[in-house]
Amino acid sequence: MNKKSLNIVVMFGILMILAFSGCVDQNASESTSEDTTPKILKIFHAGSLAVPFGEYESLYEAEYPNVDVQREAAGSVACVRKITELNKTAEILASADYTLIPDMMMPDYADWYVMVAKNEIVIAYTENSQYYDEITTENWYEIFQRGGVKYGFSSPNDDPCGYRTQMVVQLAETAYGDSTIYDDLMLENSNFEVDENADGTYLVRSPASIEVNEEKVFMRSKEVDLLGPLETGAFDYLFIYKSVANQHNLSYIELPAEINLGSYANADDYAKASIILEGQNSTILAKPIVYGMTVPSNAEDYEEGVNFVKTVLENPDVFENAGQPVISPAIAVGNVPDELSDLVTMG
C-alpha cells in the first residue's frame, strides 16, 4: 500500500470513529434529557393555603428533585370547578372548606378526602384604616356604618371566605342582639337577599351576578386578592382568615366564638345560618372552618398525588408555623389509599 492509500485509509477510519462517537454522544444526550425532565405535580389550592403549601412544595421538591410542583391558588369553589366543569386535571385539590369535596366532587371526581387544618374569621386593618384606633370586638359593625368607611370581602360565589363572611355578619345579629346588622352592612350595599325562617334560622341568597355599592364595599374573587388593596388604603377593613392576617403581619380584631366559625363548641350556633349560591344551585350550612384535601380521580399521576398528601400529613408543623391549627392525626373519609392509613383516623 502506497503512502497516499494509507492516508486515505487512516482518514476514513478517523471519520468513522468521529461519526460513531457523535451518535453515541447524541443518544446519551437524548437519554440524559429524558431522564432529567421533571414530572409535573399540579395543585389547585385555596388562596389561604399559599404560605403553607409554598413550604410543602419546597419540602417535596427537596426530597423528590425529579418532580416539579406547580401550584394554582384560587377560591376553593373556583378550584373545584376547574376540575368538575372546565375539565382541567390536578394531582391535588386542597379546599378551605372540606365539604366542597363531598358536595361537589364525590363520587365522580373523588372518593375520599382528609381534613387537615382549622381556621377562624377575623377583621384585619392597617394604620391607614379609618377609626383603626377605635374599632373593637364589640363595636366593629357600628364603625363599618360610619361615613367614608369601606370594608372588603371575597366573592361568595368563588371563595369560602366570601360566603363565610356573609354567615358571620348574619350570625352577628343574634350575638350582639341587633337585628339590623346584616341589613345595614350587606342588604343596603349589595344585591344579596336573606330569608328569615320561623325556626330562627337564616338563608342568605347570593345571586349569580353579585353587585355591590363600591362606595362602601370592596370585593374580589378570593380573599388573598384583597390584601394588597387593603395595605395600600383602597379600603379600610377586611374579613379574612386569622392565619392569613398573621402571615401578612396585619393588625386585626378577633370576633366572638359564637360567630367566628372557629369553635367546635359553637357548631350549633353556626348552623343557624346558611347560604345558597344561586348560580350554582348549591346550599352551604355554616360550620366550623376545616380544610380538606384529596387526589382527584382524574389526576394524571394519581400515585404522585397520594405521595404529596403523605408528605403533608407527615409534616403537620408546617400548618402550625403558618398560624393554622392542625388536625393531627388528620380525619379521613372514604376510600383512603393504603399508603395514608397509618397517618389518619377514619371519620
From Swiss-Prot:
Pfam families: SBP_bac_11
Alphabetized PROSITE patterns for the sequence: PROKAR_LIPOPROTEIN (PS51257)
A GO MF term: molybdate ion binding
UniProt keyword Ligase present: no
SUPFAM superfamilies for this protein: Periplasmic binding protein-like II
GO BP: molybdate ion transport
Gene3D superfamilies in the cross-refs: Periplasmic binding protein-like II
InterPro entries the record matches: ABC_trnspt_W-bd_WtpA, ModA/WtpA
Signal peptide bounds: 1-21
Presence of keyword Nuclease: no
UniProt keywords, alphabetically: Signal
Family to which this protein belongs: Belongs to the bacterial solute-binding protein 1 family. WtpA subfamily.
Protein name as catalogued: Uncharacterized solute-binding protein MmarC5_1756
Source organism of this protein record: Methanococcus maripaludis (strain C5 / ATCC BAA-1333)
Lineage, top ranks: Archaea, Methanobacteriati, Methanobacteriota, Methanomada group, Methanococci
